[in-house]
Amino acid sequence: MEVKGPSGRSFCCESEGQFKSCLKRHTPSLLLPSSWKGNSGSCLMAKALHRMSPTPNSCPLPLPLCRMSGVLCSRNLFTFKFSLFQLDSGASGEPGHSLGLTLGFSHCGNCQTAVVSAQPEGMASNGAYPALGPGVTANPGTSLSVFTALPFTTPAPGPAHGPLLVTAGAPPGGPLVLSTLPSTPLVTEQDGCGPSGAGASNVFVQMRTEVGPVKAAQAQTLVLTQAPLVWQAPGALCGGVVCPPPLLLAAAPVVPVMAAQVVGGTQACEGGWSQGLPLPPPPPPAAQLPPIVSQGNAGPWPQGAHGEGSLASSQAKAPPDDSCNPRSVYENFRLWQHYKPLARRHLPQSPDTEALSCFLIPVLRSLARRKPTMTLEEGLWRAMREWQHTSNFDRMIFYEMAEKFLEFEAEEEMQIQKSQWMKGPQCLPPPATPRLEPRGPPAPEVVKQPVYLPSKAGPKAPTACLPPPRPQRPVTKARRPPPRPHRRAETKARLPPPRPQRPAETKVPEEIPPEVVQEYVDIMEELLGPSLGATGEPEKQREEGEVKQPQEEDWTPPDPGLLSYTDKLCSQKDFVTKVEAVIHPQFLEELLSPDPQMDFLALSQELEQEEGLTLAQLVEKRLLPLKEKQHARAAPSRGTARLDSSSSKFAAGQGAERDVPVPQQGVGMETCPPQTTARDSQGRGRAHTGMARSKDSVVLLGCQDSPGLRAARPTSPPQDHRPTCPGVGTKDALDLPGGSPVRESHGLAQGSSEEEELPSLAFLLGSQHKLLPWWLPQSPVPASGLLSPEKWGPQGTHQFPSAERRGLNLAPSPANKAKKRPLFGSLSPAEKTPHPGPGLRVSGEQSLTWGLGGPSQSQKRKGDPLVSRKEKKQRCSQ
């Protein structure tokens, strides 16, 4: 604190003792206090006074008598009071004959408040009081102006008071003049910023005179503010430190006021101003305060701000530790709500919006004090730049403050909703009481904070708090998204059981990625696909139908009810037998082919035409396209003329095979179970032509509608295995209408001439064998009697099962066997008895020719009248 003595020298005190010594040295008659009141033994007082740096420009007269009292508190807040007494030359030093000028300093960080109270001590007497010259400047850092109380006289006791003249000079060149009329405002020049032009301070001057036996003394309240005037709200933040509210006036910190604006508010009490001067009516305080009250300040005015009261009472209403005042924090909370839209505009997607809003409260106030003409955009720009240069450690205080404000906002919203619940349905007081109980635990935590006091009144008297929150509802509605997490936390505390279940359900799809699920589904489809087909033919057909569906865009997924009904029907043997009997062979052929190209439209039309045909007509119709396909696909077997030559070649082949010894002759036919058809146990190569496969499949497809097939069907349809066994010569597949395929082992001697003739015989056998299914199944005699002549040995015989037995073996999907189960001859001693097994045994091509043209054809014709016409054609061709 710099003080100029009578000689004009300035001194600075660094500590409490130095401050005392300086005052003693430069002020002759100084009464120091016996003790300094404070809560710490440090030199906070001296440091705070030194930060104020009051430097008077002039000190007209020395201070004969000075009484000082100081009060220290934490957070750099203090109140310092000078009691200055000036005695004239003829008056005594008694309190009753002196006029005291009391200077009160209230300091908080960069905000200082000086209150000057001039009052006579006791009863006034004759005489005039010389000038009192305390020079005081409440300015952070630099000296801007001087407040000087010039000499004034007190009139003799009488009916009226003497004139009062006080002159306060703001800068050296532009003094502030207070006229005698209390309604005249103070005027100052525009260059009131002083030499430095930096800094801002508020000086509150309260001048109170008590003369004579006047009951209600006159009180004057002057507010002198230097160039950057910004009225501060009670408890506003100044540089990050909470400062106490002003003693007299309060306003918002953001609204800039014109430079060098000085507002003078007066309030006259009983009595007159001066003798001979009219006493004008005192203007109401509301008419003088609006220019300095911000619209954003919703806080009430402190009591005693512009009314009667001594300095002690004024200071008692604004204690130094005003940071704990709920009213000041509540106003900061409202300012924070007003600043949040500004912060969101600059940081739309940042989570620092609430903290930045808290940061704007002190920064915008400081900027407005330094430069009141600064626009809001410029202030926000400077604040944002300051925020970017602020470290994370310094930001923590604003984050904590924002967290508390969010809690207050959430609590306020809850109070509003509760008031609505209480006001709306009057018949729900019992449900409302349990809702208040869960709020009990968070209440003590927030009660520790001083700001919770306004919201604390909500639960006690919700009906009385209904009107105040009403105007705040629009503000809180816009702020609903931030406090929602706090509300969720409360609900989690209320309902612990259901909350853990919901996250568990939502975490299930997050833990298992969809790619893994799809991969699992694909693997299961690959694993379960063959197993489903192995259970039976109906399931295999349905599975293949489902596989074809994604390939055909026109098809739609089947109905689950329809599928269950189909499964039920497929479980019935009679239904399966009937379905297999009427399945179109072309459809099965195309379905089982490697590259199917089905014409569903033509197939559907053809099936519609076949609905009106009888069984015999249907058989004939199916034989015609089979012949055409036979000629188109098999070049050696084109036309019926080839069948005539095939009989002679076939007979020659029979003679050639008879000459071959039994061990080396063609192989006996042995039955191959369905499980072993897919593999070649002998290690022989699997070679077959697509032509033979197509011809064999067509032949076996046509066998399904024969009466023998419909008479008896197998219980378990064969699998859709598609292996091939080596054939004779060219290894073409030979299909017989028997239930199981047979393999023909290579037992022919190497280098024999018969091996070269077998390829042509195999083609002939393939072409002639396709005619067998239409009359061979109807033979009533056993196959051994049909195909084995007496001169053949036991290994040169062919065995064919009876009609009933063959019907059972032909029932399972002939098409599947036509495509993938070729039959080959192998020698087997089964001539004497018919084979009861699933397949038929063929010892060679001789048996096939013998069965085609042998004496058993007459018996077969007798057994099957439906195919007699076809048999005649075959006999003619042979």
From Swiss-Prot:
Residues 476-487 have a biased composition (Basic residues). Residues 278-288, 427-444 have a biased composition (Pro residues). Residues 537-551 have a biased composition (Basic and acidic residues). InterPro entries: NUT, NUT_N. Pfam families: NUT. It comes from the Eukaryota. Residues 273-324, 417-566, 627-757, 775-878 are annotated as: Disordered. PANTHER family: NUT FAMILY MEMBER 1 (PTHR22879), NUT FAMILY MEMBER 2A-RELATED (PTHR22879:SF14). Belongs to the NUT family. This is NUT family member 2A.
